């Protein structure tokens, strides 16, 4: 990796290697950076990885963290080193990134109809590649290529997946009758349910389906309800693969409200930006916009006494009733929804608790 003028957030007109940059042990606030800048907190990343790894070990589960959150080789390496079974992907493009990094086990948690991608996937020497199907047409496209298929169970009004257990059973029978494919198990996503009671009902249906079909693998589990997934699926006579991915970055909004480990996970993503104007009493404008920080679930979280009231392409509106900030001040912002944070940055400094840059994350979205 080379750090130069193309690396957003870095003041590095003359190129240096990542190794040279890290050897300098730059400070976040005195080093060659410009604002806005997203950073990751090393202690929080490491803590979150350890916490989930311990949880899955303690409950006899396998973990295939969803790589879509970070698409970062350095973070994938942390997760795999902590014991992850493999990685989850949503698209063939993500699988291509994983393959280039040498990842040997992938769960493609999405239906696939792209014939060019199917042909490429069929040629890859994975230790294990699991793919989804929820219709006869999907099975037909996968036929004859050696794919191991998870039948996806959905629910009415939900996302993908067979709408009833009977549909899923019929699809399993079709897989058994089709040459060149193998029934690997069942899978689903509980996060489209309206509440925890709905999640529990759905997971009971998924477990019952898996038992009826003697499924070798059962998979579920985003980052919001993995406690319920553990309660309902742990201890099955099957390999249970859970897929939380957002946990590694956690946040100060959506997952702080929703995660069953909200009191134990730590926000690892911080965005720093500079006040560029205080044009009227009670208002400040920050050089931070939609290209820099997530805004799909919540607006960014400002320091105490300040509130983000609006976000534009390059500017953030702050309510500052106490007149706490002035132009030039650098502020820390928290995020909501890490899955739409990492994609905004190609290189992300990792800082220790003294705000020294100790690593660089690259992303491939």
Regions found by a protein language model. Give the residues of each.
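A charged N-terminal "starter" segment
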Residues: 1-123, 361-365
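Active-site loop ensemble at the mouth of alpha/beta enzyme cores that anchors a bound cofactor
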Residues: 226-304
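Active-site loop/helix belt of alpha/beta enzymes
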Residues: 147-148, 154-259
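Flexible, glycine/charged-enriched surface loops at secondary-structure junctions
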Residues: 61-62, 214-217, 327, 342-345
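Active-site-proximal beta-alpha core segment in soluble small-molecule metabolic enzymes
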Residues: 64-195
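Conserved, mostly hydrophobic/aromatic
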Residues: 45, 68, 98, 151, ...
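C-terminal accessory subdomain/extension
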Residues: 279-365
